[in-house]
Design a protein with these regions (language model features):
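Membrane-interface alpha helices of multi-pass inner-membrane proteins
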Residues: 12-27, 32, 38
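Membrane-embedded, lumen/periplasm-facing catalytic core of multi-pass transferases
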Residues: 238-290
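Hydrophobic, aromatic-rich transmembrane alpha-helices
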Residues: 122, 126-158
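Short hydrophobic alpha-helices at membrane interfaces in multi-pass membrane enzymes
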Residues: 4-20, 49-59
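Luminal/periplasmic active-site loops of membrane-embedded glycosylation enzymes
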Residues: 84-121
C-alpha cells in the first residue's frame, strides 16, 4: 500500500483499499504502514525534497489512514452486527476513545517504545538483545546527525525542523497499537512496527554509502575511508544481531507457551480420566472441584 502510494499519482486509491484489508486482517499491521509512511518522508527530506511537498504527502497519508479506518469500522459493524457486544481485546469499544484519554495514550506509546529499546524491556528479552537495541538507537542518532551535516540540512531550517518532528513521531507510529487498544494489557499486544527502526537505520546507512560513492573520486585520507565503511559494517552487524536475537526470543517464548499449554491439557485430561473411572460416575454428572 505504501509503495503504491509513493510510486504512482493515483496510488492512493489501491493503497486505501489495501489498508482496509490490512486492518481487517490484523489491526497491529497498521503500525507498519504508518511507520513506513513516516520513514519514507524522513528519507525524502534527507535526500533533499522540499518541506512543502513532504507536508502535502503527509496530509495525503493522514487522509488515507483516516478514510481506511472509518471504512473498516463501518464494514466491521455491517459484517459483524454484534461487534459492540464483543469483549475480546476491547474490540467492542473500537473507535470509542475519549478525547481526555488521548494524551495519556500517546504517552503510553512513547513509554512502551522507550522501555523496550532503552529502559526496561520484557523479562524474556536477553541482555544481548537489549544491548543491541541500545546500540541501534545510538547508531540511528549518529547516522541522522551525520546526514544532517553532510547534506547541509542545517541550512534549511524548515526541512530540518520537519525532519526532526517526523523522527519524533516515529516511536508513536511504530507503537500505535498501544493507542488503538487501550484496554488490552501491553504484554498481549503485537508490535511488529518496531522492526522499522532497524529498517530506518539501514536506509540512512544506504544514503551514506550512496553519498560516499558519489564523492569517491575526491582524494580522501585512508582512515576516513576506513572509518566510513567501518560504520556501515558495524551498523549491519548490530542490526543483524538485533534481528537474530529477536527471532530467538520470539521462538523460545512461543515454544515455552506451547509446552505450558500442553502440560495443562495433559493435567486436566488425567483429572477427567480419574473422575470417569469412578464406579458411581454417570456420563453427564456434575463434577465439583474443591
Amino acid at each position: 500500500a505504501v509503495y503504491l502510494l509513493r510510486k504512482y499519482k493515483y496510488g492512493w486509491m489501491p493503497a486505501t483499499i489495501m489498508l482496509i484489508c490490512v486492518l481487517g486482517t490484523y489491526q497491529s499491521y497498521i503500525s507498519i504502514a504508518i511507520g513506513l509512511m513516516l520513514a519514507g518522508m524522513i528519507v525524502d527530506l534527507i535526500k533533499g525534497k522540499k518541506a512543502d511537498k513532504v507536508i502535502r504527502s503527509g496530509f495525503l497519508c493522514v487522509g488515507i489512514l483516516v478514510g481506511a479506518v472509518v471504512v473498516y469500522m463501518l464494514l466491521s459493524h455491517v459484517i459483524y452486527p454484534n461487534l459492540d457486544n464483543e469483549s475480546y481485546g476491547g474490540v467492542g469499544n473500537m473507535g470509542q476513545i475519549e478525547i481526555s484519554q488521548v494524551p495519556t495514550l500517546i504517552g503510553r506509546c512513547y513509554k512502551r517504545f522507550l522501555e523496550y529499546f532503552l529502559w526496561k524491556p520484557f523479562a524474556f528479552v536477553t541482555k544481548t538483545s537489549q544491548t543491541m537495541n541500545i546500540l541501534v538507537c545510538i547508531l540511528a542518532v549518529a547516522l541522522f546527525a551525520y546526514l544532517v551535516w553532510k547534506k547541509r540540512l542545517y541550512r534549511k531550517w524548515m526541512e530540518l525542523t520537519l525532519c526532526i518532528m517526523l523522527c519524533g513521531f516515529m516511536p508513536l507510529a511504530v507503537a500505535f497499537i498501544y493507542f488503538m487498544a487501550p484496554e488490552v494489557d501491553y504484554s498481549m499486544l503485537m508490535f511488529y512496527g518496531y522492526t522499522l527502526i532497524y529498517v530506518l537505520v539501514l536506509a540512512m546507512a544506504d544514503i551514506c554509502m550512496a553519498e560516499w560513492e558519489q564523492n569517491s573520486g575526491i582524494g580522501l585520507k585512508k582512515w576516513t575511508e576506513y572509518s566510513r565503511y567501518g560504520l556501515v559494517i558495524v551498523t549491519a552487524v548490530v542490526v543483524f544481531i538485533s534481528c537474530y536475537t529477536d527471532y530467538l526470543v520470539t521462538n523460545k517464548a512461543y515454544l515455552r507457551m506451547d509446552i505450558a499449554v500442553s502440560r495443562v491439557n495433559n493435567y486436566f485430561n488425567r483429572i477427567i480420566a480419574s473422575v470417569e473411572a469412578q464406579d458411581d460416575y454417570q456420563n453427564g454428572d456434575d463434577v465439583t472441584f474443591v
